[in-house]
Regions:
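Metal-dependent phosphoester/phosphodiester hydrolase catalytic core
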Residues: 1-296
């Protein structure tokens, strides 16, 4: 059994060459782990659109300017963005070639989404999060090749696929259905220190125990219902392998502090810092770099 896995397909950042490569890979089906679309508009300050001092590659020069121009919020906006993505010839070809199994991440809604909100949602200008979340989910079910698990609740998307006795594929929703607000300590929107300085105070507050207890010890990525569903399915399964399809890295991801600091100074400084770290003793402070991962 062979399948192709995709995630984080940002239209304005480049072409979907990997979809073309998968056409003749021998894959029998495709799995997309989320961020099939991105909600950002065409504002040059938004991720994926702006020129960088190192490459000067822009969405304009690539002919990949998104529509509508605003961050997508309404049902019409989300439908329009899916329609634009589907104009990509490689994506069209892969959908025609093989079946897909998909799950959403945050950008099908808004950056760093959770149950009650998102980093890239402003209720004062974009209305209620619940309303935006509902129309985003509706557009997803309209445009994606998915057998909707529960037509009465479009936000319930986790499900299981059994491939004979070989393996079970458990597709989770670690974003919308049960996630609490994550620790915010990152470079801007998303990891780009040229856009917004690192929020060290917020970051440190989320990592500093008070009387031996971490402030966010009660945070979770799955609801109790979904967790029980997953563990129950795994316990009852008779397949050889259990595979979890989810949106986030299931490992610790640490960066040297000097490398993180150099990132804000451009490619040359970043490369120098990486080289120095790799050639020197491994003694400096490291920090976790992706605070919405399953990194323990």
């Amino acid at each position: 059994m062979k399948f192709a896995v995709f995630s984080c397909t940002l239209y304005s950042a480049g072409f979907f060459n990997v979809y073309n490569s998968a056409l003749n890979s021998g894959a029998q089906f495709a799995v997309h782990l989320g961020d099939y679309i991105y909600e950002y508009g065409s504002d040059p300050s938004k991720f994926g659109n702006a020129s960088t001092p190192d490459t000067a590659v822009t969405a304009v020069s690539l002919g990949r300017v998104v529509t509508p121009a605003n961050d997508i919020v309404s049902l019409s906006d989300y439908r329009t963005r899916y329609a634009q993505y589907r104009q990509d010839a490689d994506l069209q070809a892969l959908h025609a070639k093989m079946p897909w199994i998909t799950i959403w991440d945050d950008h099908e809604f808004a950056n760093n989404a959770y149950v009650d909100g998102a980093q890239n949602h402003d209720a004062t200008t974009q209305g209620s999060w619940a309303a935006r979340k509902a129309v985003a989910a509706q557009a997803y079910h309209e445009w994606m090749p998915i057998r909707t698990p529960d037509t009465s609740n479009l936000l319930k998307i986790y499900r299981k696929f059994d491939f004979g006795t070989l393996f079970s594929l458990h597709m989770l929703d670690t974003r919308i259905e049960g996630r609490t607000k994550q620790v915010y300590g990152y470079f801007g929107d998303p990891f780009d220190a040229k856009v917004q300085p690192y929020n060290w105070a917020d970051y440190a507050a989320g990592l500093t125990p008070v009387n031996g207890v971490y402030p966010d010890a009660a945070n979770k990525m799955l609801s109790t219902t979904q967790f029980n569903w997953l563990t129950g399915n795994i316990a009852a399964s008779s397949t050889t392998w259990q595979i979890v399809g989810n949106q986030d890295i299931m490992a610790k991801l640490w960066y040297p502090a000097s490398v993180v600091a150099a990132f804000a100074q451009g490619q040359a400084a970043f490369t120098t810092a990486v080289t120095a770290y790799l050639s020197g003793p491994r003694t400096e402070t490291k920090i976790p770099i992706n605070m919405d991962s399953w990194d323990g």
